[in-house]
UniProtKB/Swiss-Prot annotation:
Superkingdom of source: Bacteria
GO cellular component, one term: cytoplasm
Pathway listed: Lipid metabolism; phospholipid metabolism
Biological role: Catalyzes the reversible formation of acyl-phosphate (acyl-PO(4)) from acyl-[acyl-carrier-protein] (acyl-ACP). This enzyme utilizes acyl-ACP as fatty acyl donor, but not acyl-CoA.
Protein name: Phosphate acyltransferase
UniProt subunit comment: Homodimer. Probably interacts with PlsY.
Main location: cytoplasm
Example GO molecular function: phosphate:acyl-[acyl carrier protein] acyltransferase activity
Family: Belongs to the PlsX family.
GO BP terms in the entry: fatty acid biosynthetic process; phospholipid biosynthetic process
UniProtKB keywords: Cytoplasm, Lipid biosynthesis, Lipid metabolism, Phospholipid biosynthesis, Phospholipid metabolism, Transferase
EC number: 2.3.1.274
Length: 338
């Protein structure tokens, strides 16, 4: 894999900056010299954290001073305009100016989206950039677009999500051609509201999308398609359901083991199996959600991301940069508009 420079928002997330710095160090130790990290945040504070970590590979770590931070509760558009020296703004600027090949943040999702649109700009032809998520199934994770960045969508937007998801799956997941399903209340083409019925027609007629038809909610866990298309309102609810599902099932099993009076060693054995299942159903293990449709490589993480998740996000960002997803999207939208 080619050498990559990843800009990381050191102030993004509930556990920042400590977990972010720890995650960056982990990622660097997990690779050879072909990876370097730009930690973006208050210079003095970050120097202090690194000084207490003598094992940090300083030759592959650089600090980009960003004295301001955008909080999780701040209004995205206002924060981006009023805080040009924030870690999100400066990290994206480093990517835009080619000092970094990708940008990673577990910070305010709306601010990341707004700043990316402002600094990196949309790819020509893309009306709505989309954040893609991953829904756990029995056969791996399906890519879901959109997961909350676009709650009100036109049918044409859903078609664009399908095109972006197709490029991502082909470039990063090496699935060719990836299957695309439209989340609906029934499998028949005439099912759904007006938005979904119109989107079905557009997807059916698109020659650059491998559309397999409508997908019902009950089929999602059985891997109905490589890519699932829906608006961000539905997608966000779906993703959060997936995040909580394994925890609830695990707790229910624990309660049942106690009710049946299983011995401690028996409970430990079952708990080990459940932990493996939970890990397989953990969308964070895949390393962040890609923001598709802007002129750059941006990964968005959950606010509660741990050091392990930050490290995985850095590796995922490196893959997206190496596979040049943004350029592939640009080519795809040029072809679709021709």
């Amino acid at each position: 894999m080619a050498a990559s420079r990843i800009a990381v928002d050191a102030m993004g997330g509930d556990n920042a900056p400590e977990a972010v710095v720890e995650g960056a160090i982990q990622a660097l130790h997990q690779t050879e010299g072909e990876l370097s990290v730009l930690l973006v945040g208050p210079e003095e504070q970050l120097h202090g954290l690194l000084a207490s970590r003598p094992e940090a590979p300083e030759e592959r770590l650089r600090i980009v001073d960003a004295p301001e931070a955008i909080g999780m509760g701040e209004t995205p558009s206002t924060a981006v305009k009023q805080k040009p020296n924030s870690s999100i703004h400066q990290g994206l600027a480093a990517h835009h100016d080619d000092h970094a090949d990708a940008f990673v943040s577990a910070g305010n999702t709306g601010a990341i989206m707004a700043a990316s649109m402002f600094i990196l700009q949309r790819i020509p032809g893309v009306e709505r950039p989309s954040i893609a998520g991953f829904f756990p199934t029995l056969k791996g994770s399906s890519v879901v677009l959109d997961i909350g960045s676009n709650v009100d969508c036109k049918p044409a937007h859903l078609l664009q999500f399908a095109r972006m998801g197709t490029v991502y799956a082909r470039q990063v997941l090496k699935t060719d051609p990836p299957s695309v399903g439209l989340l609906n209340i029934g499998e028949e083409p005439g099912k759904g509201n007006e938005q979904v019925k119109a989107a079905h027609e557009l997807l059916r007629d698109a020659d650059d999308v491998h559309f397999v038809g409508n997908v019902e909610g009950g089929d999602l866990l059985f891997y109905a398609a490589d890519i699932i298309i829906c608006d961000g309102f539905v997608g966000n609810a779906l993703l959060k359901f997936g995040e909580s599902m394994s925890t609830v099932l695990s707790d229910m099993c624990q309660q049942e083991m106690e009710r049946q009076g299983l011995a401690p060693d028996e409970q430990k054995l079952v708990a080990g199996v459940l932990d493996e299942v939970r890990e397989g159903f953990d969308p964070e293990a895949l390393g962040g959600a890609p923001l598709l449709g802007v002129n750059g490589n941006v990964l968005v993480g959950h606010g509660r991301s741990t050091a392990d998740v930050i490290a995985q996000m850095i590796h995922s960002a490196r893959t997206i940069a190496t596979e040049n997803v943004a350029h592939a999207l640009e080519e795809a939208f040029q072809s679709s508009s021709a």
